[in-house]
């Protein structure tokens, strides 16, 4: 618990940041519909704009996640956390001021641009921060606790939305985002010094993506920019890492497809509003928090993270299928309870990936996994947004409003099948180095 207490400022930062971002999720659908299609329960324009936004964000994060991870290995986790946390404030402040059509479009553009840097980067850097300070034997448990803190912020954010007006929701969200940034800058210690000063063995700290030691300081940033060949080399360095990357892609593909369609599907099928959305998310968040904070640390030791990953993906797939065939308004609430087990997948996947690289490569590894997951953010809207709009329209090919969600569940089924093939392997110290984009034996 001593090392975990040393991470308390990180956990508080993650809680505040996630609280500010999650609390607007139930309200944003109503705000979007009111701005674009006032008085309607179905809006194809809103669905397509959401899909375009996700695709652009995915293309941006596909490039930015590996870059941010690489730079954090050199310049520190705290320094790189500052940028996305500041950028998050800007679009929230716009809707805090006004939610009319013109302001919504301003929010839409700025949210799309800033999310290229912000989306997933705080979580990615937080995982690398944990890996800097926690030994491998306890890493999956602490990853679970970190994700559980995010889930508790999810619950608190959605509960607060339940009792706030849309205007107050965005005002509180923007204020908490500012507090999170200030708190992080004042209290969070830098972790990269821990890796350097603890005197870890040279062998355990060998970099998979080697940088030119003779580079001048003023061009060092360009040496840390990842190329496509660097990513390929990192994937080739470990079969387990490449399998984890495949699982990450299909998991993100399904999750993005679900989140893009679910709220519009529930609004069209059962006339849900922000209060029902908040209730549903609170159930999901409470189940996830209990599971990650209490069940996961015990099960990770008893079962192993590879099996726990498969269990999480199986129940994630099952709850998507149940959403897609919901025949009554109570069914989505029952499906939300599957989060009790489906939340295992993300921390287990990240822990498996983190054990395949040395301490000085944690930013690169987490950035690579996040970047490949972001590629799914590009593909998913191209597939699921047209399907969602088509099957929620007045003239679908056949009556199956949740068809796009069922297809998202199929993507999770592929991830589940791949996860079964992952076997526990000893951590990889170094298999390859990269020099000028070429993989060579050390």
Model-predicted segments: where are they?
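A membrane-interface helix-boundary motif in multi-pass transporters
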Residues: 162-177, 386-412
């Amino acid at each position: 618990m001593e090392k975990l207490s040393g991470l308390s400022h990180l956990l508080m930062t993650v809680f505040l940041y996630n609280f500010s971002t999650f609390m607007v999720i139930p309200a944003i659908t109503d705000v979007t519909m009111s701005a674009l299609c006032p008085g309607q329960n179905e809006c194809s324009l809103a669905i397509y704009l959401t899909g375009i936004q996700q695709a652009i964000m995915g293309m941006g994060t596909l490039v930015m996640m590996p870059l941010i991870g690489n730079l954090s290995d050199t310049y520190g986790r705290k320094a790189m956390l500052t940028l996305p946390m500041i950028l998050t404030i800007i679009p929230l402040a716009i809707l805090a001021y006004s939610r009319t059509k013109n302001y919504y479009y301003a929010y839409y553009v700025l949210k799309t641009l800033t999310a290229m840097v912000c989306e997933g980067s705080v979580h990615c850097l937080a995982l690398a921060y944990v890996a800097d300070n926690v030994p491998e034997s306890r890493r999956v448990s602490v990853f679970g606790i970190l994700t559980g803190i995010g889930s508790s912020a999810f619950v608190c954010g959605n509960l607060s939305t339940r009792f706030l007006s849309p205007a107050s929701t965005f005002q509180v969200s923007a204020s908490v985002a500012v507090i999170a940034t200030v708190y992080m800058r004042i209290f969070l210690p830098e972790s990269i010094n821990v890796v350097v000063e603890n005197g870890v063995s040279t062998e355990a700290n060998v970099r998979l993506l080697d940088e030119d030691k003779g580079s001048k300081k003023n061009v060092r940033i360009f040496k840390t920019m990842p190329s496509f060949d660097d990513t390929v080399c990192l994937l080739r360095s470990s079969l387990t890492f490449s399998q984890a990357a495949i699982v990450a892609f299909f998991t993100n593909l399904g999750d993005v497809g679900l989140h893009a369609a679910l709220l519009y599907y529930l609004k069209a099928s059962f006339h849900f509003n922000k209060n029902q959305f908040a209730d549903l998310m609170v159930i999901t968040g409470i189940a996830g928090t209990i599971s990650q904070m209490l069940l996961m640390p015990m099960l990770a030791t008893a079962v192993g993270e590879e099996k726990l990953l498969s269990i999480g993906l199986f129940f994630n797939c099952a709850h998507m299928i149940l959403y897609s065939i919901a025949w009554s308004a109570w069914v989505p609430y029952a499906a939300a309870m599957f989060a009790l087990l489906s939340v295992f997948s993300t921390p287990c996947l990240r822990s498996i990936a983190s054990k395949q690289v040395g301490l000085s490569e944690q930013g690169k590894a987490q950035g690579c996994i996040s970047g490949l997951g972001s590629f799914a953010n590009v593909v998913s809207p191209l597939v699921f947004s047209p399907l969602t709009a088509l099957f929620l329209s007045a003239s679908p090919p056949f009556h199956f409003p949740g068809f796009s969600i069922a297809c998202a569940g199929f993507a999770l089924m592929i991830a589940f099948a791949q996860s079964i093939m992952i076997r526990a392997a000893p951590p990889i110290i170094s298999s390859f180095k990269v020099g000028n984009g070429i993989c060579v034996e050390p």
